[in-house]
Regions:
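A Rossmann-like FAD-binding core segment of flavoenzymes
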Residues: 1-33, 91-106
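FAD-site-proximal beta/loop scaffold in flavoenzymes
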Residues: 12-13, 20-70
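A sequence-level detector of short, solvent-exposed, charge-rich linear segments
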Residues: 33-37, 42, 48-49, 75-78, ...
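A conserved FAD-binding loop/helix module that cradles the flavin
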Residues: 54, 58-101, 106
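Acidic, Ser/Thr-rich low-complexity intrinsically disordered segments
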Residues: 107-120
């Protein structure tokens, strides 16, 4: 694979790049890999994975589940461990070490705290 920057720099890698990132948000760069919700945000499964491109995950403030918005500064970061566990499990790798994130309040897999009275 060859990745070319907007400045013409070229980087070669033997593995498919995992992250498409930019200041506008990565969801715009990979929008063709996601079904869209009626509100224009990507449709995700419970593990923040695309419903049409298995193995493609979305992290960041564009993540939405039902009417829950994962705030830009803090809450969306709590979903990183959820994605990491899903990837590790799919590869047959141990994921128990990710539980340490839960003890620090950085493992958000229970969305019941995301309602009207957001705890963050």
């Amino acid at each position: 694979y060859e990745v070319v920057t907007e400045f013409g720099e070229s980087f070669t890698t033997g593995v498919q790049p995992l992250l498409a990132h930019g200041f506008e948000g990565s969801q715009k760069l990979v929008s063709n890999l996601f079904e869209m919700r009626e509100d224009g945000f990507p449709l995700l499964n419970d593990n923040d994975e695309s419903t049409i491109a298995p193995g493609m995950f979305l992290c960041g403030p564009a993540v939405r589940h039902n009417d829950f918005i994962f705030c830009f500064i803090y809450k969306y970061r709590q979903r990183f461990a959820v994605v990491a566990k899903t990837i590790a499990t799919s590869l047959g790798l141990p994921a128990e070490g990710l539980e340490v994130y839960r003890s620090y309040g950085m493992y958000l897999d229970d969305l019941s705290c995301c309602g009207e009275a957001c705890v963050c």
